[in-house]
């Protein structure tokens, strides 16, 4: 899903710098990653093999995405901090690349994060101001810090026969317009199922947009989308993201509107100039949208049929995603290469 698309974007930037650069990605599914991204790959938890590879590498990139946070778990945070430490000790230069930071809320985790990043990271490029503020609050001052943009904004799926074939086989019909809903399970999500279903029906009734219920992370998101689908009384598609980042972005580009909780769905839509409505379950979502100058979002707990329909009206009326806004973000993202 989104992780594969991020990797595709990072690999493309690195290949732009040096087409022959050997790249090794850490992955939970290394066989799939090798095939999809055309890079070498090691299993995320093969620590001895990773350490051996690091001794022969010059640079360790941590990112994109939001890896330095303890919302998921302290264990997840400790893994990413320890990988940074291990890379530096193996002789790699360390860069956190086009990433989000935070929230880091537990006091002990704040100390660990500041200590590790101050000691081992050389450069940190961030995708939003919220992350910059989080680093400042943590006391991270030693690395060079640059506010750039998410690497995923640079993905260009093109308009190849393969892309057209993929869209056709996904069930997207020529001449039909679509509104994509990228939702995920979260605390009290069940209380808002009817609101999302009503909003999807509204988009269909008022604007002729067929709802696409899109599982960016299929294993996690499927149940939430099925619950919304069960309440729909209009035609819809239920689709799942595959492992090809270019195809994910091509599908999102085909949409007339995107309503999403999933951050990278919003990032991909913004990069393609598709109008977006954000539903915020985590500060990283509002942080990105604020950085974009985009105010069409609301917290999940305030998601009602009326509020969602109002935002849909505004997004459809503005029909912006200002090309100038996107261009400036892409220019910022190019700074990741520098």
PLM feature spans:
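Active-site anion-handling motifs in enzyme catalytic cores
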Residues: 1-338
């Amino acid at each position: 899903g989104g992780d594969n698309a991020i990797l595709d974007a990072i690999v493309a930037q690195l290949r732009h710098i040096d087409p022959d650069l050997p790249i090794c990605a850490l992955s939970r599914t290394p066989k799939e990653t090798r095939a999809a991204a055309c890079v070498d790959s090691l299993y995320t938890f093969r620590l001895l093999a990773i350490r051996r590879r690091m001794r022969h590498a010059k640079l360790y990139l941590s990112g994109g995405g939001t890896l330095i946070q303890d919302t998921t778990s302290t264990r997840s945070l400790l893994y990413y901090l320890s990988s940074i430490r291990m890379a530096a000790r193996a002789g790699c230069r360390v860069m956190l690349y086009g990433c989000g930071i935070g929230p880091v809320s537990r006091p002990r985790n704040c100390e660990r994060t500041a200590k590790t990043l101050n000691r081992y990271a050389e450069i940190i490029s961030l995708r939003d101001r919220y992350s910059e503020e989080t680093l400042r609050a943590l006391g991270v001052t030693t690395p060079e810090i640059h506010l750039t943009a998410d690497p995923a904004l640079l993905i260009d799926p093109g308009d190849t026969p393969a892309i057209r074939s993929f869209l056709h086989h996904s069930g997207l019909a020529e001449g039909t317009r679509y509104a994509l809903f990228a939702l995920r399970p979260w605390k009290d999500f069940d209380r808002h199922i009817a609101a999302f279903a009503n909003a999807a029906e509204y988009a269909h009734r008022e604007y002729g947009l067929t709802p696409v219920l899109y599982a960016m992370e299929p294993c996690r998101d499927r149940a939430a989308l099925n619950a919304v689908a069960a309440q729909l009384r209009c035609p819809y598609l239920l689709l799942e993201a595959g492992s090809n980042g270019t195809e994910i972005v091509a599908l999102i580009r085909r949409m007339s509107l995107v309503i999403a909780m999933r951050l990278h769905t919003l990032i991909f839509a913004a990069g393609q100039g598709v109008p977006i409505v954000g539903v915020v379950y985590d500060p990283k979502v509002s942080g990105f949208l604020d950085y974009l100058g985009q105010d069409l979002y609301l917290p999940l707990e305030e998601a009602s049929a009326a509020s969602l329909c109002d935002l849909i009206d505004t997004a459809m009326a503005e029909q912006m995603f200002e090309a100038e806004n996107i261009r400036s973000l892409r220019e910022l993202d190019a700074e990741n290469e520098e």
